[in-house]
A protein has these predicted regions:
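Outer-membrane beta-barrel "beta-signal"
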Residues: 397, 409-423
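Hydrophobic, lipid-facing positions within transmembrane beta-strands of outer-membrane proteins
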Residues: 87-93, 128-133, 177-181, 216-220, ...
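Transmembrane beta-barrel strands of outer-membrane/channel proteins
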Residues: 66-74, 107-113, 146-148, 194-198, ...
Length: 423
């Protein structure tokens, strides 16, 4: 534990010492791996109702350096008389701005209060964490960045190559920031970037013990841009975002694997074609009485279709085991082994659109995962009330096959409501 803390301290001191001694220009966010900024201000509400009328709107921020957001979340289970499964209050407090003449920085803190009816209340009543914090400097043809943020690899979010940042889970796919040191070198029509993570985040059940130590994670991306098309080559040693249970000893492990990948996109008249492919070496896998390492080929193909405000996304994903035997196993959610298939196919279709002068937005999606072992359908309705207020209503339903990895999620139903104020 002490060694881990010392490594992180040395990592931060080295990074800040290096960054504070460079001469930078003002192009802070040209980097492909720069943090994806959160949504900006919402369009002004055009309704005449005085519930959120002109008095509620602030024409000019009194504290322009302060970003404040308060979100109230509720979750209900329709299958159990709409019992409350989620009731929490989240507060985000952040600031951003220039650091001398050479850089830019952002800091955001997130505090969460779990109420007694929330499913997390029994284990955690409140939480405070650094949601994101980074410094970025640019000088000549170089850009460097250190802090806690997200790195997006590949063309498709959550696809074969987008494996650096873990997601919040099956029903919450948003990426979780991690602590990185990264650098990018820009050329005329290409760029070369590197990242290093001394303590990758690994998701696991709180009831399970992570058996192995944490490994370092690092990677390289070389991208080439041309008119109407982009492509990139990826190399790295990565740690699985989700720990895998060893069915033999009951412990969970997250040992590194090696990745070589290629991604590209091509713009056509009516759609954007996206393609990723990655060879992954030394991926952990269960076999009857054994815990082994295998090679796997992952790929995905997606069509991003934009028609005015309506957007369609259609994708296909494959995970193909190059090494395979009939006694390979996949752990279920409950930790029981089920038969593994050589090729796992997943499909996704989503559509979204806006109406009411773009104050309202709706979305529908359907995900078929693991050769139809799981079928997830969801719907969302968002309302941008005015510059400060936003509301969102969503619903999720899961149908899962018996005696397969996701069987415990069969007939999963949730209705979620969020109300957000931002300043």
């Amino acid at each position: 534990m002490l060694n881990s803390v010392l490594r992180q301290l040395i990592f931060v001191i080295f990074g800040f010492t290096f960054l504070m001694n460079v001469n930078a220009d003002d192009s802070f966010f040209d980097d492909d791996i720069a943090f994806d900024e959160s949504e900006g201000d919402f369009d002004e509400w055009s309704d005449d109702s005085d519930i959120f009328g002109e008095e509620a709107a602030i024409e000019e921020k009194r504290l322009p350096w302060l970003d404040l957001g308060v979100t109230q979340k509720w979750g209900f289970n329709p299958a159990s008389y709409y019992s409350t499964t989620q009731e929490r209050t989240e507060m985000n407090l952040g600031t951003s701005g220039s650091v001398s003449d050479s850089g830019y920085g952002e800091v955001e803190l997130k505090a969460t209060k779990y109420w007694p009816s929330d499913s997390n209340y029994s284990t955690e009543k409140s939480d405070l964490e650094v949601e994101q914090a980074f410094l970025q400097f640019s000088f000549d043809d170089w850009s460097t960045k250190i802090g806690k943020y997200t790195i997006g690899w590949g063309e498709l979010e959550g696809g074969a190559i987008d494996v650096v940042n873990p997601s919040g889970g099956l029903t919450d796919p948003s990426m979780i920031p991690q602590w990185f040191l990264s650098a990018t070198r820009y050329f005329d029509h290409s760029d070369l970037s590197f990242f290093y993570n001394t303590n990758p985040k690994v998701s696991k059940s709180s009831l399970l013990i992570l058996k192995n130590d944490t490994y370092d994670e690092f990677g390289m991306r070389y991208g080439i841009s041309s008119e109407g098309s982009d492509m990139a080559l990826y190399l790295g040693q990565l740690v699985p975002n989700d720990a895998l249970i060893n069915l033999t000893d009951g412990m969970v492990y997250a040992t590194p694997y090696q990745l070589i990948g290629f991604g590209m996109n091509k713009a056509f008249d009516d759609f954007l074609l996206k393609f990723d492919i990655a060879l992954k070496n030394n991926v952990q896998h269960n076999r009857t009485g054994q815990f082994i390492k295998v090679d796997r080929l992952d790929w995905d193909l997606a069509f991003d279709i934009q028609n005015d405000d309506r957007q369609w996304l259609i994708s296909i994903n494959s995970q193909y085991l190059l090494d395979y035997a009939n006694d390979y196993l996949t752990p279920s959610i409950l930790g029981v082994g089920v038969g593994a298939k050589r090729n796992n196919m997943s499909y996704m279709v989503s559509v979204s659109d806006s109406f009411g002068d773009s104050d309202w937005k709706w979305g529908l999606s359907n995900v078929i995962s693991s050769n139809n072992d799981l079928n997830l359908s969801s719907a969302t309705l968002d309302w941008d009330i005015n510059d400060q207020w936003q509301a969102s209503l969503s619903g999720t339903y899961i149908d899962a096959k018996d005696n397969r990895a996701y069987a415990a999620l069969d007939d999963y139903q949730r209705v979620n409501l969020e109300i957000k104020y931002q300043y």
